[in-house]
Amino acid sequence: MRVADFTFELPDSLIARHPLAERRGSRLLTLDGVSGALAHRQFTDLLEHLRPGDLMVFNNTRVIPARLFGQKASGGKLEILVERVLDTHRVLAHVRSSKSPKPGSKILIDGGGEAEMLARHDALFELGFAEEVLPLLDRVGHMPLPPYIDRPDEGSDRERYQTVYAEKLGAVAAPTAGLHFDQTLMEAISAKGVETAFVTLHVGAGTFQPVRVEKIEDHHMHTEWLEVGQDVVDAVAACRERGGRVIAVGTTSVRSLESAARDGVLKPFSGDTDIFIYPGRPFHVVDALVTNFHLPESTLLMLVSAFAGYPETMAAYKAAVDNGYRFFSYGDAMFITRNPAPRGPEETV
């Protein structure tokens, strides 16, 4: 399978650079996995597609203000994007500067604070901070908006680039399908008899990295930490028992559930995953998906194509572009039911 199969034309004007006034004010494109039928709706219409007894699985990771600005002791400016917090004083981070800092060199953080470059691990730098990392980030860090938003973060992003149910600190990118849900909608979902469960996957900056190979099969996914608890396993089993559907909110919830069911049976799991879901890979847990619109040639678009079928997904994206849907993190959403016999690009030529 070629990465180029997953490209599409996207006008720059359709990239959402700010959130709408209301979280649930987005549009919703629905895709029926059996018939391939599309429907243009509002996000609040999602309730009409839910059934009593369904289970919605959310990712409760919380985005940390992971971007720091500073300078080396020599005076050169640099930018730090924390990828993973290792302990109270150490992180793994991406560092952008004219020259990479060397082990032992000091970094002065804008707003107050100091770090030391401890070691380099391939593309990542291990940094040690004089004070505790999380309070420092909360005090002087910036929200790590994706590169395609291409604007400085604003005070409102601390709230809006965060789900209302965010709980466990550790992500450097939001699980964006969840940004559409406000407390009122969450209560309406519960009132309809739909159960909820929460996994944790700390989204890393690697989610924005382009696929740099020509053949999908040659791509190696970045790793991210996740946790699927016994409570989630029990909730999925109870959902199956009553004939409900497991509805993943976001691709990170899909990757969490499917990582914990690699042998076909869902089990509690805590640790790193590098699961790469693309056309041809079976799904063991998820029956329906709420997701945003993703970048061309991205692993997330490949995941959606594996779930809904390649021709159906690309047709849906063309319809979204033609109808002026807003794309990416602050954009609109899709509700997709799983295609029981999804085709890949090579089967549609």
Swiss-Prot record:
<dbReference type="InterPro" id="IPR042119">
    <property type="entry name" value="QueA_dom2"/>
</dbReference>
<dbReference type="GO" id="GO:0005737">
    <property type="term" value="C:cytoplasm"/>
</dbReference>
<comment type="pathway">
    <text>tRNA modification; tRNA-queuosine biosynthesis.</text>
</comment>
<comment type="function">
    <text>Transfers and isomerizes the ribose moiety from AdoMet to the 7-aminomethyl group of 7-deazaguanine (preQ1-tRNA) to give epoxyqueuosine (oQ-tRNA).</text>
</comment>
<dbReference type="GO" id="GO:0051075">
    <property type="term" value="F:S-adenosylmethionine:tRNA ribosyltransferase-isomerase activity"/>
</dbReference>
<keyword id="KW-0949">S-adenosyl-L-methionine</keyword>
<dbReference type="InterPro" id="IPR036100">
    <property type="entry name" value="QueA_sf"/>
</dbReference>
<comment type="similarity">
    <text>Belongs to the QueA family.</text>
</comment>
<keyword id="KW-0808">Transferase</keyword>
<dbReference type="GO" id="GO:0008616">
    <property type="term" value="P:queuosine biosynthetic process"/>
</dbReference>
<protein>
    <recommendedName>
        <fullName>S-adenosylmethionine:tRNA ribosyltransferase-isomerase</fullName>
        <ecNumber>2.4.99.17</ecNumber>
    </recommendedName>
</protein>
<dbReference type="InterPro" id="IPR003699">
    <property type="entry name" value="QueA"/>
</dbReference>
<dbReference type="InterPro" id="IPR042118">
    <property type="entry name" value="QueA_dom1"/>
</dbReference>
<keyword id="KW-0671">Queuosine biosynthesis</keyword>
<dbReference type="GO" id="GO:0002099">
    <property type="term" value="P:tRNA wobble guanine modification"/>
</dbReference>
<comment type="subunit">
    <text>Monomer.</text>
</comment>
<keyword id="KW-0963">Cytoplasm</keyword>
<dbReference type="Pfam" id="PF02547">
    <property type="entry name" value="Queuosine_synth"/>
</dbReference>
